[in-house]
Amino acid sequence: MLHDHPSVGPTAILTQFGAIFVSLELSRSNWVLTSLSPGNGEKMSQYSLAAGDIGGLLARFAELKRKAKERTGSDYPIITIHEAGLDGFWVHRVLQNEGIDSYVVDAASIATSRRRRRAKTDKIDGEALLRALLAFKRGEPRVCAMVVAPSPEEEDRRRLCRERQTLIAERIIHVNRIKGLLFAQGISDYVPLRRDRRKRLEGLRTGDRRPLPVHLKTQISRELDRLELLLDQIRKVEAEQEALLAAESKAAPEGEPHNAVAMLLAVKGIGEHSAAILWSEGLCRQFSNRRQVAAYAGLAATPWRSGAVIHEQGLSKAGNPQLRTTMVQLAWLWLRHQPQSALACWFRARGERGRKGSIVALARKLLVALWKYVTHGVIIEGAVMKPAA
């Protein structure tokens, strides 16, 4: 689609176009469009729209196509790019439904100036996005990282796991707040998650044998109200998650591959919550190799090798945080429930030195092994399966 050819002019781009290229700089207040059209002197044009004005956006695209046809006598398709961010994927889906070739890019993967104080405007960002799109369509390697947009069903399916994690984090906050308030009064044995929490609150005495102050007791009572609401919501979310897993893990029809959720649940040491996160956050997607799997979870290494300087910077963490956290937790559980597996033996052979780094390496190896197991049916060496129900 793109062919190099000489051009004149200091701001001309050395490319012959077979399409109209548009970058979208999205924000809460307005959208900035940067376009590059055939027959327009190879100059970038910019337009501004109100945020969310999808009708105005499509009208602008129609105008760009009309002007390009007037100049060249040919119809050209539109190719767009915008950063993954606050707007999610709804704009991308609208454009695809309109027959527009749309790309979503990881903003952190686009090269920028490394000066400590660099200019940053919507105009500069829009032009940088457009240059990245042109290079990507020319087939240049490592230009940027395009995001694979999930389907609406995939996006909705992972809501339950994420909502549960949010509720658990809020529960921890309330429990710690209650414990902190009471510890300041010399009370260290109160457990807010016990069923008799209300009854025990009435009988509490401070470290100097006084009844709880009135306002403190009232505050803790309100904290318990919020805590109990959270506990009820967690139970409801977990019930929905169990129902979804039950539907996903039903036996596949004869002649079809086994269901991935059922395969994960069959492995000893993997429970319903871990299986739900593994499937909805990672293993439901398509990967070409193990490096892509590790990179998607943010478990890939980041070496620094320049001349005589060679060292490791640690994990990139440029990936799915829910999947990464779950895999590190699952790695510890794997050592407990699968001590005779090849992965556990590999971990023990490394000894106590570098235990923190080793558990992350085990998490990476385990994720790759589970991916091979789910997608290709490769049994994890030495792994024990749960007994059939």
Q: What is each PLM-predicted segment?
A:
Residues M1-A389:
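A detector of single, family-specific signature residues
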